[in-house]
């Protein structure tokens, strides 16, 4: 992908079909990159007749990097990505995330490892560019006119070996970036920390994901009765 706005047409078409099936309200939801995409969609289409609330599950509002890397390295890679979109660069993603999920390793879930491989050592620079451009809009502050719930783990870690941190933390993104960028947003915005949550909160350990759903449904009862 070279521009996250490429997804807008697909989301709009899906909402059109949902409306044709006589549904009158939708909770727009997205995880990680999807959380970034859906947040911006809600900002860009503030008067959509179906979208009544937004749930962002550990949204990708910034890269899990140092301040220097964010201010210098990422913009430079983004610029290279505009010129050399297919070039690859080390992703820096923690190698223990997928093993914490998949039943083949240490997790409880079954999914296609060709689609979501055990590790992703490299990333195309066009992806870095697309994400960076979208994040710049988030960082400036956006307005959301629908109730928004941003949920994330209570902590981020970058474990170098398998252990408890990989099972009870967000090892992909920095949760502080989520809360800091949420504070820049205008509207009915709520952030919620989930103790021992994984990056994808609904794939966390059973007691944790049960709490995720309890909190989400309690919020929905207030915002989308």
Which residue ranges define each predicted feature?
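Alpha/beta-hydrolase-fold enzymes
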Residues: 29, 33, 37-123
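Active-site nucleophile elbow and catalytic-triad environment of alpha/beta-hydrolase enzymes
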Residues: 122-141
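Short beta-strand/loop motif that positions the catalytic acidic residue
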Residues: 150-152
